[in-house]
C-alpha cells in the first residue's frame, strides 16, 4: 500500500524496505503486472535484520536444522514470513511444507518457543526484538546461525541484501556475534516530488541526524555517510542527489 500510494501520488513520502522497492520498480513479486515504479529514494533509515531464536535445550544450532519441525514464522505475509519463505527456498526446501509453520507475531511466537509449542521463532526487523529479548531474559535461549553456503546463496541471489551480524550481548546470554543478513529500510518519495522539496527534506534530516539518533538509537546507521549514500536498488531522487553532492557525501 505504501509503495502503491507513493508511486501514484496519493502520498508524497513513504517507508519501505529495499527488497520490496526493487520488486516495485521491476514489476516483480507482489507487484507483477502493476505499474508502481514512480518512486525514488531520499535516504535509508535503518536496517531490518534476519534473526531466529530457539531454546538452548533444543540442541539446534543452525536454521537448517529446523526442517521438519514446528517453527513460528511471523504473521502471514509479514516481512518475517516472506523471509522465512525465502530462506527455506534457498535451502532447496519446499516452503511451507518443509516445516510445521505457525503464523505468529514476535510476542506470541516467542511465547510458543518458551512453552515448547514451536522449536524456533523467525523475525525480521531491528534488534533487539522485544519478544526475543524477553525470551532470552526468561529462558536459556540462543540465536540460530546460518550454514555459510545458505547465507552466501542468499547474498548472491538477492543483491539488495547484505551480510551483517547481531553483536554479542544484544540478547541475554549471547556471548558471540551471529552472522546473518539484512536490508535497508528507505524513505521514498513520489518520483514527481519537486527537486526543491526533496532537497529540503533530505537537508533537514541529514543536518539533524544526531538529534534523531539521540531520540532513537535504532537509527544509528544514519550517522554513517557510507550507509546513507551507499548503493541502493532504486535511484535517489534528483533533489536528494543535489544535497548529497553539496554536502560532499557523493
Annotate the PLM regions.
Residues 1-3:
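Short, small-residue-biased leader/transition segments that mark boundaries at the very start
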Residues 18-20, 28-29, 58, 95-193:
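Pocket-lining segment of extracytoplasmic ligand-binding domains
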Residues 69-86, 160-232:
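Ligand-binding clefts/hinges and TM-proximal coupling segments of bilobed small-molecule sensing domains
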Residues 47-115, 213, 230, 234-239:
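Bilobed "Venus flytrap"/periplasmic-binding protein-like clamshell domains
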